[in-house]
Amino acid sequence: MNQEKKQTNLLKNKNLIGAIVAIVVMAVISLVYFYPDAINGNVLQQHDSTQGIANGQEAKAFTEATGEVTRWTNSLFSGMPTFQISPSYESTKLVSWIGKVYGLGLPAPANLIFMMMIGFFILMLAFKARWYVALFGAIAYAFSTYFFIIIGAGHIWKFATLTYVPPTIAGIVWCYRKKYALGGIVAALAATMQLASNHFQMTYYFAFLIVAMAIGYLVKAIKEKTVKDWGIGTGVLAVAAILAVAANAPNLYSTYEYSKETMRGGHSEITTNADVNAPKGLDKSYITAWSYGIDETASLIVPNVKGGATIRPERGQNKLMSLAETKTAQDLLNSGKISGEEYQYLAQFPQYFGDQPMTNGPVYVGVVVFALFLLGCITVKGAVKWALLVATLLSLLMGW
């Protein structure tokens, strides 16, 4: 008995040491990848971030001058509330502090990649992966091209929200594996941070995965005659969700009220006669303008299947990635098959020819990761696998 206890303690110590090693490795990778910019305090030129800073400058200046927080600004749209420009509430100060700790206090944008890795690392541990396997999965997940694309575009709220999705799933997994306290705490905290990151659209899409997982675990529980345990786990998760919503109630309510007066939720009272009978909400073409084309989905494993990116950053400017820069065009020019004038003509056309207006790059997860996904589909058994597979296919369909 004592020998078994010693072995258990030894295993726990090894796992703890492994987790610490993994955290250090992830922090180093994050800093090295963005070296020397993150270390030197250099700032990326991010369109959405720059625009957001400009929009919130008037409100920030008012706070610095008076010590009071304003909920109105004249900096855009002839005046509007600051609910979605610079949402800040006394109730979220603790949440903001937790976010900094979660990013290990690393300089931006290294902290963002670290947050993405640590979140997936926690999820892998919930699935009982060894620490080094969890570390590999975390690195592979975080270095999907999409995350770097949205960092470059300045979609920081979206990125932050996505960093808390994996640990929220981890909490769900632990709850359905009867680790109610651990799962409930992790799920509540991660969901709270997710909502506090203020990109509710991502949380909305994540809800589809939550439902799929709950159904998958229910089917599993029915087969194993453990429906009572499923009910307890679901109850714990429901409480976690309520706590997360309650912690973010001020911002959620303000967003709900404000949405009624926006193009997304309705119409402003200031309308023309032509607008009175217009349908509520966004136009379908507007909503789907940045949707992936069906054949463009192949970029998950073949990055340049639709030509790659439209532009690339170069010395603080965005440069068009034209057809003239392709090896084929240069070979044709060098062989005399096209004239210099024709070559210059190619310089006016982008390499990207997908369905989106433009793109900063393809969403590429990697052939190795995709191969592991297929292997998992074959080797893993049970209803939960099928639920996750259905959710994956649904996400692809929604992306079109």
Walk through the language-model features, giving the residues of each.
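Membrane-interface helix-loop-helix junctions at transmembrane boundaries of multi-pass membrane enzymes
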Residues: 13, 222-235, 322-346, 372-396, ...
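Alpha-helical transmembrane signal-anchor/signal-peptide segments
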Residues: 38-51, 255-271
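Membrane-interface starts of transmembrane alpha-helices
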Residues: 14-21, 99-108, 129-137, 183
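Membrane-interface junctions at the ends of membrane-embedded or membrane-associated helices
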Residues: 2-14, 173-184, 215-232, 378-383
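Membrane-interface coil-to-helix junctions
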Residues: 29-120, 127, 139-162, 276-365, ...
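Start-transfer (signal-anchor) and selected internal transmembrane alpha helices
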Residues: 1-35, 232-241, 374
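Hydrophobic alpha-helical membrane-interfacial segments at the cytosolic entry of transmembrane helices
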Residues: 19-27, 228-256, 265, 272-275, ...
